[in-house]
C-alpha cells in the first residue's frame, strides 16, 4: 500500500507539473500574439519549417540531457533503465513551473522512491547535472560573448567567474560521495552508511571521476551549442530579418538561462530570463526592444514546447518497450 501511495503522489505531481507548464505555454503564446506586427515588433511572421527544425533540435537535446542524467544515476550506483529514467527526469523537469524551487527535485525523488529506487541518488545526480549545466552555461556565454556577458549579471564579469569557481568545487568526487551519504540519512534510506550505493546493493561505483566529469561537461557544452542553433532556427522562423548567428545566440541563451535559474522567486525563471535575453540582444546585437521581446517570448514558448515534446516522446518509447511498474528487483519482490 505504501508503494501505491508513493506512485499516486508521483502521478499527481506530474499532472500538476503538466498543468502549470501548459498554462505557461498558453500564456507565452498569447503574449507573443499580443506583441503584434511591424509597428510594435519590427515585423514577424511564421515559417513552419524553421520552427519545426528548432522544435526537433530542442526535443533531441532534452532527450540527450535526460540520458546523461540516467548515466550519472547509474554511475552513482543506481540500477535504472534508460527508458525508465529518461521520462522520469523529463517529467520532473516540468516541476520547475510550479511555484517554489523545490518541486523539480521533490518530484524526481518521489517518483524514484515510488518505483523502488534510491531517491537520494536521484536527487544528487540531478543536482550534479544541474551544476554542470550552470557551469557550462557560463562557459558558453563567456566563449560566445566575452566580457559582454557581464551585462546580464549587473555589469560585472567577476560575478559569473566566482560563481563558476564555487560550483566546480561542488563537483569534487569526495564532496559528491559525502553528499550522497548525507542525503541518504536525510531521506532515511539504507545507503547512509557509506558512499553512493554501499549498503543498498545498488552498486559501488561511486561518484564520477575527474575525466568523466570533463566528458559530461563537454557533452553539456555541445548541448548549449545545439540550443544556440535551435534558437537561431526560431529566430529565422519568426523574424522578417535574421539576427545574429548560432554561436552568439548560444551565449545569449545560456547567460539568460543562468540568470533566470538564479531567480529564486520566479518559477522556471519566468520574466527574469526574458528580461536578461532582451538586454543581451540589445547590448550584443543592437536588436530593438520590440524585436528582442518577440524573440525572448518565443524562446520561452519554444523551450516549454520542447520539454513537453521530449516528455511525450520518452513516454511513448517507454510504453512501446512495455515498461510497467517498479523495475528494481527488490521492489518487485524478485529473488
Feature names for model-found ranges:
Residues 91-98, 254-274:
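Transmembrane alpha-helix interface/packing and boundary motifs in multi-pass membrane proteins
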Residues 1-90, 137, 143-262, 284-335:
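Predominantly cytoplasmic-facing regulatory/coupling regions of multi-pass membrane proteins
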Residues 81-84, 92-97, 104-108, 121, ...:
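A generic structured-segment signal
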